[in-house]
Amino acid sequence: MSFAQFFVACCLAIVLLAVSNTRAAVQGPPLCQSGIVEEMPPHIRKVCQALENSDQLTSALKSYINNEASALVANSDDLLKNYNKRTDVDHVFLRFGKRR
């Protein structure tokens, strides 16, 4: 087997592994499907509920971050007009020491 054949075989194996892992991740855990959860013990139901809540939290955080990013992009024109200099006065610089 030449190096080129070995390289192609390795690349093909990596692609197949990536595709199979992606499909498994998209399907989600089989134990937390709605028809099966009712038959599970209470502690498993709590775990499934926690997983569902974490998914909801993740989607809420993603939407919040996207909204904040879009607000920053919308305000970027104002920042560019002022050349990134601050216009509000919320601090004062005091200098102590000898006069020159």
Curated annotation (Swiss-Prot):
<keyword id="KW-0165">Cleavage on pair of basic residues</keyword>
<comment type="similarity">
    <text>Belongs to the myosuppressin family.</text>
</comment>
<feature type="modified residue" description="Phenylalanine amide">
    <location>
        <position position="96"/>
    </location>
</feature>
<dbReference type="GO" id="GO:0010459">
    <property type="term" value="P:negative regulation of heart rate"/>
</dbReference>
<keyword id="KW-0732">Signal</keyword>
<dbReference type="GO" id="GO:0045822">
    <property type="term" value="P:negative regulation of heart contraction"/>
</dbReference>
<dbReference type="GO" id="GO:0045986">
    <property type="term" value="P:negative regulation of smooth muscle contraction"/>
</dbReference>
<feature type="signal peptide">
    <location>
        <begin position="1"/>
        <end position="24"/>
    </location>
</feature>
<comment type="function">
    <text>Myoinhibiting neuropeptide.</text>
</comment>
<dbReference type="GO" id="GO:0007218">
    <property type="term" value="P:neuropeptide signaling pathway"/>
</dbReference>
<keyword id="KW-0964">Secreted</keyword>
<keyword id="KW-0027">Amidation</keyword>
<dbReference type="GO" id="GO:0060457">
    <property type="term" value="P:negative regulation of digestive system process"/>
</dbReference>
<dbReference type="GO" id="GO:0008344">
    <property type="term" value="P:adult locomotory behavior"/>
</dbReference>
<dbReference type="GO" id="GO:0005615">
    <property type="term" value="C:extracellular space"/>
</dbReference>
<dbReference type="GO" id="GO:0005184">
    <property type="term" value="F:neuropeptide hormone activity"/>
</dbReference>
<protein>
    <recommendedName>
        <fullName>Dromyosuppressin</fullName>
    </recommendedName>
</protein>
<keyword id="KW-0527">Neuropeptide</keyword>
<feature type="propeptide">
    <location>
        <begin position="25"/>
        <end position="84"/>
    </location>
</feature>
<dbReference type="GO" id="GO:0071855">
    <property type="term" value="F:neuropeptide receptor binding"/>
</dbReference>
